[in-house]
Amino acid sequence: QKPEKTSLPAVEAVDWPQSEVDRFLLAALEEEGLVPARDAEADALLRRLYIDLIGLPPTPQEFAAYGVAWRKDPVAAYRAKVDELLARPQFGERWGRHWLDVARYAESSGKEVNMTYPHAWRYRDYVIDSFNEDKPYDQFVREQVAGDLLEIESDEDWQENLIATGFLALGPKGLNERNPRQFALDLADEQIDVMTQAILGLTVSCARCHDHKSDPIPTTDYYALSGIFQSTRTYFGTVNLAVSRRGTKLLDLPVADEDPLRSMSSREMAFVKERLEDAERQLEELQRSARERRRDGGNNNFQQQILRLRRTVTGFRARLNGVDSEGVGKSLGMGVQDYPRPVEPVVLVRGELDKPAQEVPRGFLQVLAHEGTSEALPVDSSGRLELAQWLTSAENPLPARVMVNRIWQKLFGQGLVTSTSNFGATGQAPSPPAFRRSNSMTIGP
């Protein structure tokens, strides 16, 4: 529901509140016969600011300087210190980490085959820089969901937006899945799960197999969302091996890294190409010998040799794929882009691949539909751009409230809604209850 201006609760200690939020909290305390704790002393307050904002304690010199400023004007000293800490690079590192937890940031794929993501760091740095640049939250969301589809003014903008979509490329993956269709559906499911929990505070993925048991999210809505992500190609960059069948390429980024260690001379390129050709020839001969041995009923002793040669071939190919035709190191990253033609999704009964039901159009969650929600998505693109615009619309209050609640949790140890990624019926109601319809849980300009 859209927040609305509500009348503030009456309180007895009218001089204590400094904001609307204080009025709600004080009213709840007074209802229980309690009074607020006294204000913190200068040293305690300074330590809280440092730990909360940059994750480091103040030095003795900083304690002393703050004490001098505090004695002159406590309010001015406090506000100046907040501004100073927000401007430090450690602020982005501290608070970017909180978002990275929500975005399930890790540098490997997890699950049965734990392959590394050597380029995940670009997304990590993007998040840190976004916090340090005080990027508006709606822009932050749009870039991560559909950065590759946003308008740009420079190659640098294009690169940043591509890296932002690493939000969708990270996460656990069943890289040993034999069925490519099943892998695509599982990948889309994981992307739906992280997007809806991180941004909307809703658990949508259980609607893959049945209508949501607690929230008004039918299976048709789940597959409408799934179609958007099935129409999206994900680049996460793991290699293909015998135990990892679903590796992909990485995105070629427009701004080259100035890293001489990643470049190759023409002589080195020729050497690697020659070694690659030799390894591919040996691998082909070994595989042919293994097939002939099996056909003749003999023992096949070549499996370990074949695996070693495959790893060698993969390594040489990766080395060549990391440079352009001139040997200059490419700038690579994780992220997503649209497939040429979108997928029109089909509902799968109980989520089972061999039990297709009706086709549904790509779309959004109807329970959150608002004025301006698109009736039909474009036939020539995935619909992620429209999804990003829908998520960040001024008519959609949920993303801002979810983010405000996450900030509250990190500052006070517990969110106003304690189930920070579940604002649904199975989550916890806001406390105090008056916050449910209040506009106090919004992000200001």
Regions found by a protein language model. Name each.
Residues 191, 195-198, 275, 309-312:
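Amphipathic alpha-helix face/heptad-repeat signature
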Residues 288-302:
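Charged, low-complexity interaction regions
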Residues 374, 378-379, 386-399, 403, ...:
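Structured secondary-structure scaffolds
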Residues 251-280:
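Short, charge/polar-rich alpha-helical segments
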Residues 269, 273-276, 280-283, 290, ...:
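Heptad-repeat amphipathic alpha-helical coiled-coil interaction surface used
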Residues 301-344:
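Long amphipathic alpha-helical scaffold segments
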Residues 438-445:
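N-terminal low-complexity segments that are often proline-rich with Ser/Thr-Pro
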Residues 1-252, 337-357, 361-366, 399-437:
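Short, structured secondary-structure elements
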